[in-house]
């Protein structure tokens, strides 16, 4: 990968098998994670350990925030179940790592200004689930009101790329729990010169990931949805 390309991942959600497959495919170059390392899945410590060991730059997601603070007020009961389980098993060191993550990350690469946030730039932790097709005016406002050339968002678990005014707003999709009807692990790259976004999808051992979720006593839906991409 050349210096003009950056790799983005998001919403790993403690899915070790999906993360390992993605990182095996991505060779070289900086990797950025748009939040939610944990939640739903059965390997929070292993995921955090890998992210830390590889120096992947991350921002804080809403599940990360809930795990390290205990604030579950914005979650449904099944998600709360997974958050409380994760709080019990995550190491103190890894919890402190999550708490240290920035809510927004601003970068400059090859004369391109970049803004990374989990949900939305104005409300990175508790913002809405947004998509260019359902929220066109919001995306137009981001393109006109923010100075950044590139804006990366997570949270939705659905990949997209919105191009406007020589800018791009994108979501790489979810590594560990896609929700667009396709269960494959997702990530994307961006060419800093052309702003072209390339999306990638990879299969992984979903049987193993699902079995771990069930064996951990987590809600079964978090296992079954891995096969449906919902």
Predicted regions and their residues:
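Beta-strand-turn-beta hairpins that frame and shape the catalytic cleft
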Residues: 1-7, 107-115, 164-168, 194-196
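Active-site-proximal segments of metal-dependent phosphoesterases and phosphodiesterases across multiple
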Residues: 75-80, 114-146, 178
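Conserved hydrophobic/aromatic beta-strand scaffold that supports enzyme active sites
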Residues: 104-106, 116, 161, 187-189
